[in-house]
Structures are given as structure tokens and as C-alpha cells.
Curated annotation (Swiss-Prot):
Function: Catalyzes the reversible interconversion of serine and glycine with tetrahydrofolate (THF) serving as the one-carbon carrier. This reaction serves as the major source of one-carbon groups required for the biosynthesis of purines, thymidylate, methionine, and other important biomolecules. Also exhibits THF-independent aldolase activity toward beta-hydroxyamino acids, producing glycine and aldehydes, via a retro-aldol mechanism.
Pathway participation: One-carbon metabolism; tetrahydrofolate interconversion; Amino-acid biosynthesis; glycine biosynthesis; glycine from L-serine: step 1/1
N6-(pyridoxal phosphate)lysine modified-residue sites: K225
Species for this entry: Leuconostoc citreum (strain KM20)
Reactions mediated catalytically: (6R)-5,10-methylene-5,6,7,8-tetrahydrofolate + glycine + H2O = (6S)-5,6,7,8-tetrahydrofolate + L-serine
Name of the protein: Serine hydroxymethyltransferase
Principal subcellular localisation of the protein: cytoplasm
Subunit field text: Homodimer.
């Protein structure tokens, strides 16, 4: 019996989602298109196998083949980032962060991470997150004029707070992060340094962003986004920390690992080790910079921090008459997918926001080049400037869908 015959409702929803992905232009910075190999691994018989523990040291029998798969993932990940130690079991980036905190901190310890409005992540100390509930969290922001990290201000804050851990990394920051400066700050106050490179991992792997491995005490990441793998997490560190990180994952915060997802991770890491991945990562940045230039040339759409060095950037829509939520919904209506984004010193609700975030990993996977990226940016500008003109929006949608359908993913 086919999948369609077995469950036509689920099958239909999946088919419709596939069609939606192909006909829309995906600009959510945290999304990408996984390869056929990655997707096949996740739908393989490995989903049937329980394997508590670690390769060659399990609590269950019958693990000889999942051991091979997980060890491949570990070895490839270590090679990709030059790490002494790697754990590929975290179910997500948030799980990886939770385990990293558990391994190095005690409940009530102080952490200093990037503020949400500055581009940080919920798990970097936001009060609504476990990281802001289990630990005393403090946050740093950006320089008011440059909208970039102010390392002297962060150092001053670290001296005042005296945190046990400093967290570097972001989910909406468009400039290079100087991990060596964070290391100096952490050393000065006697803190551990954790880097969350979830968004930039693919760029780091390609040598296009500084590598935090070997600088930070612990590095966490997701495996999708710029790495183009399955949805999941990883932890990288030094061998001396292996035992406590392993224990923080299992049995500390997870039970059985998802070996079918780990197989997908292994495939993605293998893909990222190939020479063509560096060209792909370079094109991501070129596309982001090409788009940012289009917005910079307008009078009412401002690129936060003045541009981008990576795969994303934020747009300040204050002068357009639209907020982030309205713009996200507007662009959805013309088959361009983005997300609303809080800006530095945001005054609106996180459900509304003053901006949107733009990312290029997904369109680059589909073969978009700089000319295509500029075309997309121009469509966005047209939609924003004619948000109440149904005829113009109809034309923008048609053009966006034609552009998308000429860059199909497999």
C-alpha cells in the first residue's frame, strides 16, 4: 500500500507543503533545503532503533550498525571544524545549549549573553527561556550608532556582572563576531566562553567566518540553517570536557538519540566537507550582500548595522508606514517568505516588531545568484512601496512565483 493510500490526509498535506516550498521564495534565515540523501536517512529504518548511550557503549543490544553511523557523524563533524571532541546527539540547538549550560554551570550561576533585541537567541538568557529561569541572566547589546558589538562595553559589563559563563553568537546579527575578543573578556573575569554558532556554522565550515572551535570552551550549533542538514543540534569542545558534556546530554537531558536524524547529520557533514560546499557558502554571502545593496539604495528601508558579512540582515521598516508583522504578511501574500524581527532598542511588541529578517541560505541552495537576489530585493521594495495596490501586488506575486519555479529544488 502506498503512502497516499495509507494516509491520504497526511500525504496530501505533505504534497501541498512541497508545492508551497517550490513556488515561494524562502528568505527565512534559519531555513534551508536538505538534500535527498539527508531526507532519505531520516525516513530510513534507523528510526526504529533505540540506542541509549554512546557508540560502542550502549545500554541496548543490536546497536552495531547505528554505532557505525553515529561514529561517522562524530568523525566528520570533528574534521569539519577541527575539533577534539564532538557530540551529535542533541535533538536541537536549544537542547545543545541546555546541555552545555548543565555541563559547565550550576543552577543560579550567572550568564552574560546577547539581548534578544540585539540579535540574540531565547536560550542566551531570555527571561521566558529556561536559560533565564535556571540561571541569573544578564544581557549585552550593541553600540547605538554602529549597531555592532561593542567589545569594550561588553568587557565593562562582564567586570560588573562577574558571570560564570559568557555566551557569544546570535540569531539575527549580520556582522563578523570576534571570538578572540570574547575569549579575552572571559579570561579576564574567569568565565567559561560558550559560542552558539547555529546560524553561521556553514560559513565557519567553509572558512568564511572565524572559527570559534579551539577558542571557546564549548561550541554549540544546529545542523540545518547554513549547514543544510537535518533539524538537530551538536556540541563541540575539548577532549578534557568530553565526559561532563556527554553526561549532560545522556542521561542529563535526553534519553535515546534519534539515530535516523544522526544519519542525516552524517550525510550533511560529508556534503559540507566537499569542495563545492565552500562555493555554495560564498554564494550565500554574495547573495545577501547583493540584496542589502538594493535596500540601502532606498530612502525608507534601512539595513540594520549598515550591511552584512554573513547570510542575513535585518530591515528597519519604521519609515515605510508598515511594521514587521504587516510586512511579513504582505510578503507572504506575494509568495515571499520572511519573518518579523525585533530591532535594537525595539519599542514594539515581539509579536509586531519594527523590522523583518532576510536570509539567503535557502535561495542559494536553489541556485539563485546575485542577479536573482537583487531581483527578489526589488520585488520586496515594490511590494512595500505599493502595499495597498492590489494590481501591483498581483504582478509581484506572479513574478516571484515564476522566479521560484525556475529554481526548483529536488
Amino acid at each position: 500500500m502506498s503512502f497516499k493510500e495509507l494516509d491520504p490526509e497526511v500525504w496530501s498535506a505533505i504534497q501541498q507543503e512541497g508545492a508551497r516550498q517550490n513556488r515561494t521564495i524562502e528568505l527565512i534565515a534559519s531555513e534551508n533545503f536538505a538534500s535527498k540523501g539527508v531526507r532519505a536517512a531520516q525516513g530510513s529504518v534507523l528510526t526504529n532503533k533505540y540506542a541509549e548511550g554512546y557508540p560502542y557503549k550502549r545500554y541496548y543490544g543490536g546497536t552495531e550498525y547505528v554505532d557505525v553511523v553515529e561514529q561517522l557523524a562524530i568523525d566528520r563533524l570533528k574534521a569539519l571544524f577541527g575539533a577534539e571532541y564532538a557530540n551529535v546527539q542533541p535533538h536541537s540547538g536549544s537542547q545543545a545549549n541546555a546541555a552545555a549550560y548543565m555541563a559547565f554551570l550550576q543552577p543560579g550561576d550567572k550568564i552574560l549573553g546577547m539581548d534578544l533585541d540585539a540579535g540574540g537567541h531565547l536560550t542566551h538568557g531570555a527571561k521566558v527561556s529556561f536559560s533565564g529561569k535556571m540561571y541569573q541572566s544578564y544581557t549585552y547589546g550593541l553600540d547605538a550608532e554602529s549597531e555592532q558589538l561593542d567589545y569594550e562595553a561588553i568587557a565593562k559589563q562582564a567586570r560588573e556582572v562577574q558571570p560564570q559563563m559568557i555566551v557569544a553568537g546570535a540569531s539575527a546579527y549580520s556582522r563578523i563576531i570576534d571570538f578572540n575578543k570574547f575569549r579575552e573578556i572571559a579570561d579576564e573575569v574567569g568565565a567559561y566562553l560558550m559560542v552558539d554558532m547555529a546560524h553561521i556554522a556553514g560559513l565557519v565550515a567553509a572558512g568564511l567566518h572565524p572559527n570559534p572551535v579551539g577558542i571557546a570552551d564549548v561550541v554549540t550549533s544546529t545542523t540545518h540553517k547554513t549547514l543544510r542538514g537535518p533539524r538537530g543540534g551538536v556540541i563541540l569542545s575539548q577532549e578534557k570536557y568530553a565526559k561532563k558534556i556527554n553526561s549532560a546530554i545522556f542521561p542529563g537531558s535526553q534519553g535515546g538519540p534519534l539515530e535516523h536524524v544522526i544519519a542525516g547529520k552524517a550525510i550533511a557533514f560529508g556534503e559540507a566537507l566537499q569542495p563545492e560546499f565552500k562555493a555554495y557558502a560564498a554564494q550565500i554571502i554574495k547573495n545577501a550582500q547583493a540584496m542589502a545593496e538594493v535596500f540601502t539604495a532606498t530612502e525608507d528601508i534601512r539595513v540594520v548595522a549598515g550591511g552584512t558579512d554573513n547570510h542575513l540582515f535585518n530591515l528597519d521598516l519604521t519609515k515605510t508606514g508598515l511594521n514587521g508583522k504587516q510586512t511579513q504578511e504582505l510578503l507572504d501574500s506575494v509568495s515571499i517568505t520572511t519573518n518579523k524581527e525585533a530591532l535594537p532598542n525595539e519599542t514594539l511588541s515581539p509579536f509586531i516588531t519594527s523590522g523583518i529578517r532576510i536570509g539567503t541560505p535557502a535561495i542559494t541552495t536553489r541556485g539563485f545568484n546575485e542577479a536573482d537576489a537583487r531581483h527578489v530585493a526589488e520585488l520586496i521594495v515594490t511590494a512595500i512601496h505599493h502595499y495597498d495596490d492590489a494590481k501591483v501586488l498581483k504582478d509581484v506575486k506572479k513574478e516571484a512565483e515564476i522566479l521560484a519555479m525556475t529554481h526548483l529544488f529536488e
